UniProtKB/Swiss-Prot annotation:
This is Cell division protein DivIB. InterPro entries: Cell_div_FtsQ/DivIB_C, DivIB, FtsQ_DivIB, POTRA, POTRA_FtsQ_type. It comes from Streptococcus pyogenes serotype M2 (strain MGAS10270). Residues 1-103 are cytoplasmic. The chain crosses the membrane at residues 104-124. Belongs to the FtsQ/DivIB family. DivIB subfamily. The gene is divIB. Residues 36-92, 322-382 are annotated as: Disordered.
């Protein structure tokens, strides 16, 4: 029996390599677990210590803040003078820096002058390009020629003083009402032109001569070049033409467009009486001195006019026709003259009316005096 027990103990002591490694692995794992446990305990203790230290520091800071507040209050009450801060003085510049700053404007001016001088020597300083805007009767070549711009002129001269090139255009070309020479980079110049409008045409030999709104005449044009509707002035006196053109510019454009021609009526009583033919077939007689005052009434009267009517504005305003004016006037008899002189006597006036009733039917009555402008306007509105 004793031998059997010794054999069993010997079997227990003999271990394989794998068993030995396993035993070592378990021991190491146990040691690591114990070390991790110790580290956790140490970390917990450290955290507690840090928290306690932080609480203590906050308490100390609160105490120090209270002390500083109390000290500030005490300092305000005692009104102790504050310490002045030291002002930093700028560093002194050297003599060379001061001299450079003083000479810098002179250097820049000299460089600019040198650059301009070099540019003026080059051919680019005289190269110019032109264009025109707003023209209908003039072209670019005429404007350049009238402005007296030379190929040798510097474009800087045009930029600095454009007026000396604009004034000759206004004196030379009658079409131009205003002109402005504007500059565009790098060397382009634009003629901004405003032209006079054509108010009427004067009939001359082999054509028609346009009359501008300033009263000046320009080169004649052919009949094929005329617009569909235009106004013809058949007046010879240039002063009267210029005055009439100025008057027409003040009238409504719709009324002026309806005028076909204007000529002198050759009246013995009114020297400046004008005969105005309208495109609608009517004729207006009006003194030139009263044109702007009376002619606008035609716009209201024409609504009630028959075709080919005559509106006489020489004395007052009344309407008639050519047929009525062509009728011969019957001279008054001596009895009618006597009745006119003794119109205050009722008996004789009644006798004269009886005699008038016996006159032949083919005799026309004397011409009536024209009504006033107010009466005609009331009839037109009615």
């Amino acid at each position: 029996m004793a031998k059997d027990k010794e054999k069993q103990s010997d079997d227990k002591l003999v271990l394989t390599e794998w068993q030995k490694r396993n035993i070592e692995f378990l021991k190491k794992k146990k040691q690591q677990a114990e070390e991790e446990k110790k580290l956790k305990e140490k970390l917990l203790s450290d955290k507690k210590a840090q928290q306690q230290a932080q609480n203590a520091s906050e308490a100390v800071e609160l105490k120090t803040d209270e002390k500083t507040d109390s000290q500030e209050i005490e300092s305000e009450t005692t009104s102790k003078p504050k310490k002045t801060k030291k002002v930093r003085q700028p560093k002194e510049k050297s003599a060379t820096q001061i001299a450079f700053q003083k000479s810098l404007p002179v250097l820049l001016g000299a460089l600019l002058l040198m650059a301009v001088s070099i540019f003026m020597i080059t051919p680019y300083s005289k190269k110019k390009e032109f264009s025109v805007r707003g023209n209908h009767q003039t072209n670019l070549d005429e404007l350049i020629k009238a402005s007296k711009v030379k190929a040798s002129d510097y474009w800087l001269t045009l930029l600095i003083s454009p007026g000396q090139y604009e004034r000759p255009i206004l004196r030379t070309i009658p079409w131009v009402k205003s002109v402005h020479l504007s500059y565009h980079f790098p060397n382009h110049f634009l003629f901004n032109v405003i032209e006079f409008e054509i108010i009427a045409y004067a009939q001359v030999e082999n054509g028609f001569q346009p009359i501008l709104e300033n009263g000046k005449r320009v080169d004649k044009v052919r009949a094929s070049e005329l617009p569909k509707s235009f106004l013809i002035l058949n007046l010879k006196d240039e002063k009267a033409i210029q005055q009439l053109v100025k008057q027409l510019t003040t009238l409504p454009k719709k009324l002026v467009k309806n005028i076909k021609s204007v000529s002198l009526a050759n009246s013995k009583t009114t020297a400046d009486l004008l005969l105005i033919e309208m495109h609608d077939g009517n004729v207006v007689r009006v003194p030139q001195s009263q044109l702007t005052l009376k002619l606008p009434y035609y716009q209201k009267l024409k609504k009630n006019l028959e075709n080919d009517s005559i509106v006489d504005m020489e004395v007052g305003i009344y309407t008639t026709t050519q047929e009525i004016e062509n009728q011969p006037e019957v001279p008054l008899t001596p009895e009618q003259n006597a009745a006119d002189k003794e119109g205050d006597k009722p008996g004789e006036h009644q006798e004269q009316t009886d005699n008038d009733s016996e006159t032949p039917a083919n005799q026309s009555s004397p011409q009536q005096t024209p009504p006033s402008p107010e009466t005609v306007l009331e009839q037109a509105h009615g």
